[in-house]
Amino acid sequence: MALEMRLPKARKPLSESLGRDSKKHLVVPGDTITTDTGFMRGHGTYMGEEKLIASVAGSVERVNKLICVKALKTRYNGEVGDIVVGRITEVQQKRWKVETNSRLDSVLLLSSMNLPGGELRRRSAEDELAMRGFLQEGDLISAEVQAVFSDGAVSLHTRSLKYGKLGQGVLVQVSPSLVKRQKTHFHDLPCGASVILGNNGFIWIYPTPEHKDEDAGGFIANLEPVALSDREVISRLRNCVVLLVTQRMMLFDTSILYCYEASLAHQIKDILKPEVMEEIMLETRQRLLDQEG
């Protein structure tokens, strides 16, 4: 049995070395954003006594004359085209209910998915009876937002071979505000693992497949044993994601890769120790600043 004793370490607050990220205009509910009446009121704001006031805690964003406040911690608000990772919670008539970290359950229609083998035909009664064979409660899927209803509920689709059931890997749940929007959210990292950065804050880390089975239609999960080296890479990436989230840094492929490379000098179990987290975070942040400028 290994016993580890650690003493408190005097260290400067991390906020003293935040660099450019500290210049964000942060507000709390009740703060006055501006007294200029020429601006339009956006999400997270309201007008009071001819002043624009914040109604949520977050960062102020301005687009031309529109001012809104992006909450630091919130549920996922779906937008058409978003990539999400979700968990099947219920099988219903011609549809699945999916948990996507939003206020309401999302919906995946039977007509919005590829049939096994990629067949292009109308869904029949036999397909409806076999729905639980395609996806059942507890299964994880990757999908794209097809539509957003007036009440905020989200409709999903998996009409591409890159979407579908997820096999073996690790799921990390973070705040959706920390996931950076990019052209692609599927990344094969050079360290030997892949990540899906869901816009809804669900991060899926899995071993990079050698080849994709296109005949499966995205609904056959690979359950072969994962090699120890791959499991170690996945565990290290998972701890790196948790580290970045703890330090409120944006999640995208470059930040995760830089954090992974900075953590190679430490054991996986030591990454989340406070003094190690500070060392890795400072190196990661410096590399990102060097890349920007």
UniProtKB/Swiss-Prot annotation:
Entry's Gene Ontology cellular component terms: cytoplasmic exosome (RNase complex); cytosol; exosome (RNase complex); nuclear exosome (RNase complex); nucleolar exosome (RNase complex); nucleolus; nucleoplasm; nucleus
BP GO annotations: positive regulation of cell growth; RNA catabolic process; RNA processing; rRNA processing
Ranges where the S1 motif domain occurs: 79-159
SUPFAM superfamilies assigned to the protein according to its UniProt record, in alphabetical order: Eukaryotic type KH-domain (KH-domain type I), Nucleic acid-binding proteins, Ribosomal L27 protein-like
Keywords assigned by UniProt, alphabetized: Cytoplasm, Exosome, Nucleus, Phosphoprotein, RNA-binding, rRNA processing
Family: Belongs to the RRP4 family.
Protein name: Exosome complex component RRP4
